[in-house]
């Protein structure tokens, strides 16, 4: 984790606490970001939290960015950030339905088709709808593996057996590869979320 990311998280936790919003911090170790995101989502679904905030290890942000994400009461809100390529170019990984007709919504929001999960706020209802519409995404593990993963996410019950779904996965369709975050956006959009 970059120092700037850790400072962003600490400042955000402080701002949330001062606003009376309870927040919890959860991280996992995994060489696969898809597996890590699915594990974290599983732990979130077992919790009594309403929202999950995804934060990549190299993203810097202000507490105000997160507070603004909570205001509009949308199911999914992301704060796009520059693509980590050429520092002299400004490029964002967002997809608009019609880039020539971008409508500014209340709270200075815009609707996008796809966006990055590096700073994405997701309401629990999103995953509940995805579970209902896509039971085939359920991941099964041997008991010994489930026990290990439950410990990793601090689950007191069998969260892995109940909530481990493949929400976050890369896709390859029509010769186009998408990372797990853009594929998640597409999955949610297909489910009318």
Q: PLM ranges: what are they?
A:
Residues 38-51:
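Active-site nucleotide-sugar/metal-binding loop of Leloir-type enzymes
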Residues 48-60:
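Short beta-strand-to-loop acidic/aromatic patch adjacent to the donor-nucleotide binding site
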Residues 169-179:
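Active-site neighborhoods of divalent-metal-dependent phosphate/nucleic-acid chemistry enzymes
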Residues 191-193:
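Short, intrinsically disordered, charge-balanced linker/junction segments flanking boundaries
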């Amino acid at each position: 984790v970059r120092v700037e990311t850790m400072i962003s998280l600490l400042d955000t936790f402080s701002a949330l606490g001062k606003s009376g919003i309870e927040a919890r911090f959860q991280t996992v170790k995994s060489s696969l970001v898809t597996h890590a995101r699915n594990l974290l989502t599983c732990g979130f679904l077992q919790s009594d939290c309403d929202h999950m905030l995804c934060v990549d290890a190299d993203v810097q942000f202000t507490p105000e960015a997160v507070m603004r994400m909570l205001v509009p009461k949308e199911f999914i809100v992301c704060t796009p950030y520059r693509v980590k390529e050429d520092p002299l170019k400004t490029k964002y990984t967002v997809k608009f339905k019609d880039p020539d007709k971008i409508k500014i919504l209340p709270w200075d929001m815009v609707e996008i088709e796809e966006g990055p999960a590096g700073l994405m706020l997701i309401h629990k209802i999103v995953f509940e709808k995805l579970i209902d519409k896509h039971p085939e995404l359920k991941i099964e593990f041997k008991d010994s593996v489930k026990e290990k993963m439950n410990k990793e996410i601090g689950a007191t019950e069998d969260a892995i057996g109940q909530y481990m779904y493949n929400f976050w996965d890369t896709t390859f369709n029509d010769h186009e590869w998408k990372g797990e975050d853009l594929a998640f956006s597409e999955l949610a959009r297909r489910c009318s979320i």
